[in-house]
Amino acid sequence: MFDHLLLRTPRHAGARKANFENTSQCMTELASRNHVVKPLLKWAGGKRWQVPHLRPLWNQCSHYRLVEPFCGGLAVTLGLRPRRALLNDVNPHLINFYSWVKKGLRSAITMKNEKGMFFAHRDRFNALLEAGKSHTREAALLFYYLNRTGYNGLCRFNRRGGFNVPFGRYKTISYANEFLDYRKVFEAWEFTTRDFSTLELRKTDFVYADPPYDVPFTAYTKDGFSWDDQIRVAEWLVQHP
């Protein structure tokens, strides 16, 4: 298994040594804004554990824009809590959920940790996808439920584009009924779903790139994410030093 992590800091910031004398003060100021740090979704390969290691770098650049070409479960972005962010992912269902949270999403479906309900909601979600209604509020809520209830936080689709993650068999699961705290956090963040190579980067952007794993089981989208895509990521970042 390869875990490809690439980090690009603003040019002038990357040339400086970290000012560790100011780090404590910066982290204190940041902590006051960090009342929401826990991701809404379970996400395989989340990098929440890296946030303490990234903070010394981020504290030098926190007035710039944070860019994640593969934002996933938002563990890093929620941990760093930038004022401005460009958050992209090739998974349209993920971005649809975040976009609805930003609008003020509230639960309008029944959510229980029951096998029968899981498969019923999974069938309904796939029916919405087939009907071209993957952008709807209902699809966003179903995606959230399936993520919380499905196996190990996986997001997997078959070749026809159907969500096929099995039931998770957890003892207990907590579900959110509303997402208002996250809405406030998301206000100044831009969410997009496009190929990473089409993102317009600025010289002052702080870029954190964590592409999908290069392993066979990750049919992360209908079209997947191949080794050639991994190479494209590296080449794209080289073009934006």
Residue ranges of predicted features:
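SAM-dependent methyltransferase catalytic-core segment centered on the flexible catalytic loop
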Residues: 214-241
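Residue-level signal for well-ordered alpha-helical scaffold segments within enzymatic catalytic domains
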Residues: 53-57, 79, 96-100, 143, ...
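Hydrophobic alpha-helix-in-membranes signature
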Residues: 68, 81, 210-211, 240
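SAM-dependent nucleic-acid methyltransferase catalytic core
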Residues: 2-8, 12, 18-51, 56-64, ...
